[in-house]
A protein has these predicted regions:
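Non-catalytic beta/alpha edge segments that cap or flank active sites
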Residues: 1-194
Length: 194
């Protein structure tokens, strides 16, 4: 199960339509070959609400992966990273570093992004939680990575590492569509595709 959380004061109050959750659902539908279902939440940019939502998705709903979108900039109301770190048992800094590296190919303000990724563990379950950018185009770019004019991957997106991370924390074996994003696993962890 995948938790999808869009964090936006204005979208959560109906000022405008949320684009984060639909973008994540569309991308996952094209990228995942394994069966999956989503638990979605559209919430305000408020640290206690974000932390409570992440905790509920992992501890109660049993999500193995939670993707958030929004609330990662430097504005005073942007508290997604702090709320995510508050529920973490382990930090996974490489995900945020790679997202900023990918986004810097497009905009110099990517350096202002504060996305984090963490593991949340309970006695019998663990999940990977990743903060993604707020814009659908940036979500796709950071998940897929960069390609040259011929469509060959030049910079891997962060999702290439997600299936193996889920393996390592005891979650289900996730298969991806290599045309969208090729999951990387060491040979010893690979299975024959179904």
């Amino acid at each position: 199960m995948v938790g999808l959380v869009s964090i936006s004061d204005r979208a959560s109050t109906g000022v405008y339509e949320d684009k984060g959750i639909p973008a994540l659902q569309e991308w996952l539908a094209g990228a995942l070959r394994s069966p999956w279902r989503a638990e979605t939440r559209l919430i305000q940019d408020d640290a206690p609400t974000i932390s409570a939502t992440l905790t509920e998705l992992v501890d109660v709903a049993g999500c193995d992966l939670v993707l958030t979108t929004g609330g990662t900039g430097p504005a005073r109301r942007d508290v997604t990273p702090e709320a995510t770190l508050a529920v973490a048992t382990k930090e996974m800094p490489g995900f945020g570093e790679q997202m900023r590296q990918i986004s810097l190919n497009f905009v110099p303000t990517a350096i202002l992004s504060r996305q984090v990724a963490v593991i949340r563990e309970t006695a019998d379950h663990a999940a990977l939680i990743i903060n993604l950018p707020g814009q659908p185009k940036s979500i796709r770019e950071t998940l897929e990575g960069l390609r040259d004019a011929d469509g060959k991957s030049t910079v891997p997106g962060i999702f290439a590492a997600v299936p193996y991370c889920i393996d390592l924390i005891g979650g289900p074996y996730i298969e991806t569509d290599a045309a969208v994003v090729a999951a990387f696993r060491p040979k010893s962890a690979q299975r024959t595709p179904r």
